[in-house]
Amino acid sequence: MTTPAKKRLMWDFKRLQKDPPVGISGAPQDNNIMHWNALIFGPEDTPWDGGTFKLTLHFTEDYPNKPPIVRFVSRMFHPNIYADGSICLDILQNQWSPIYDVAAVLTSIQSLLCDPNPDSPANAEAARLFSENKREYNRKVIEIVEQSYV
């Protein structure tokens, strides 16, 4: 039986295939529409440029009324990404709206890479370096980008 959540996710997947945002891809895992793998490519002309970052998205039957659980699988160094890969992003929490689809979620995460919020840190060291020593922060990001090739 196709539930409203599964119908919406099928629509999201078709839209993502038909009109993918630049630097983003995603698809259901093993033909399970409720679990997705995604890739975000680091935006050009940023320290993230050239990186390929893997994520997982897990949806419940409450989608789109509740946000997916999104985690980076790739190792990250970012003020708003926890050590376990979970992401501190308002639209994945208290600012969620059913109008957001998978493409909007992934685009927002891609934007967060370049525009972190150091006032809401998930990684205190990354937030401190971002605010106080941008050169060292960028060096650590470039290390992460190089590791993402593997």
From Swiss-Prot:
Enzyme class, spelled out: transferase
GO BP annotation list: protein ubiquitination; ubiquitin-dependent protein catabolic process
InterPro entries (UniProt xref): Ub_conjugating_enzyme, UBQ-conjugat_E2_core, UBQ-conjugating_AS, UBQ-conjugating_enzyme/RWD
Domain UBC core: 4-150
UniProt keyword Repressor, yes or no: no
Role according to the record: Accepts the ubiquitin from the E1 complex and catalyzes its covalent attachment to other proteins.
Protein name per Swiss-Prot or TrEMBL: Ubiquitin-conjugating enzyme E2 3
Species the sequence originates in: Arabidopsis thaliana
